[in-house]
From Swiss-Prot:
Hydrolyzes the pyrophosphate bond of UDP-2,3-diacylglucosamine to yield 2,3-diacylglucosamine 1-phosphate (lipid X) and UMP by catalyzing the attack of water at the alpha-P atom. Involved in the biosynthesis of lipid A, a phosphorylated glycolipid that anchors the lipopolysaccharide to the outer membrane of the cell. It comes from the Bacteria. Substrate binds at N79, R80, D122, S160, D172, Q175, H203. It is an enzyme of class 3 (hydrolase). Its cofactor is Mn(2+). HAMAP family: LpxH. This is UDP-2,3-diacylglucosamine hydrolase. One of its GO terms (molecular function) is manganese ion binding.
Amino acid sequence: MTTLIISDLHLDPLRPVVTELFLRFLREQVSGADALYILGDLFEIWIGDDMPSEVADMVVAALRTHADAGTPLYFMPGNRDFLVGADYAARAGFRILPDPCVVDLYGEPTLLLHGDLLCTDDIAYQAFRAQTRDPEFIAQFLTQTLSARLAFAQQARLASHAHQSGLKQENDSTQFEKITDVVPADVAAMFACYGVNRMIHGHTHRPALHMLQVAECACTRVVLGDWYQQGSVLCVDADGLVLEQLLLPG
C-alpha cells in the first residue's frame, strides 16, 4: 500500500484541465491508497468556506467519496488557501493539519510543511504572512462581505505578482532563485527542532529529493512539484518514496 502526498495544485476555474487531472487522480490512484495528504495551495484562492465555487464543489464531492470509503484524507493550508476552515473540512471529510507537523509514514517520523516558513530571505512575504495568519486579522476578515474579501484577495495576488517581478528586476537570476527558495540554515534548524531525518514540503514549485547532513545525521528533504505543466505526486511506502509526474489531459 502507498501514501500519496501532493501540493500546489492551485485549482482555478481558468485552468479546468488541472481540475480534470486532479479528479482523475482521485478516481484512479487514491482509492487504493493508505492515505492522501494535501500540503497546501489546493486552491488558487480561498476567501472563506462560504465562497461560492463550482470547482470547490466538485472537489468536495470527490474527496467525500474517498472519505466515506475509509481513506484517510489530510489537508495542510498553504499561502493561497489558509482560510479553508472546519466547515469545508467537514464536507470534504478531511482533517486539517497544523503547519508544520510530524507524522509517522511506515515507521519513519516525517516532518510535513507547506514550505513557505522556510523561505525567510523573502522578508516582505514573511511580513505579509505574519499579518494574514494573525487570528485577529482572520476573524475580522471573515466578517467582511464576500465582495470585499474577493477584492482584497485579488489585490493581494496582484501585489504578489508585482513583488515577484520586482525581485526579478532587482536581482540576477541566481540571487532571485536564492531569495524565493528555502534558506538552508532554516531547513537544518527545522530538522534539529523536530528531531526527524525526513522532511516533505511544497510551495517552491521545485520538485527534487535533497540529501543533506544535519548534526552528523543523514537527512532527506523532499520538495513536491506544482500542477501547472503537469501533475506531481509523491508516493511513499515501506520501501521508500518516489516523485511521479502526471500528464495533463489532452
